């Protein structure tokens, strides 16, 4: 939730920068948004990988037990 609010803040900062014709500020805010999005995507992907690995190990154990 906090990360989504931060991304929203980045987009709002970019919009304010465009409204004030401060394109440096707008560009900086959008770069931060993209960086945050990439970090969150990588974190989600890592969590999905860990879950898949745990499931695979559980299936192997159950198969070996039978």
Curated annotation (Swiss-Prot):
Pfam families: YBR230W-A. This is Uncharacterized protein YBR230W-A. It comes from Saccharomyces cerevisiae (strain ATCC 204508 / S288c) (Baker's yeast). It comes from the Eukaryota.
């Amino acid at each position: 939730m906090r990360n989504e609010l931060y991304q929203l803040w980045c987009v709002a900062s970019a919009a304010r920068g465009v409204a004030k014709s401060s394109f440096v500020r707008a560009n900086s805010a959008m770069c931060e948004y993209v960086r945050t999005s990439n970090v969150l995507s990588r974190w989600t992907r890592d969590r999905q990988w860990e879950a898949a690995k745990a499931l695979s190990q559980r299936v192997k154990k159950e198969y070996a037990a039978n």
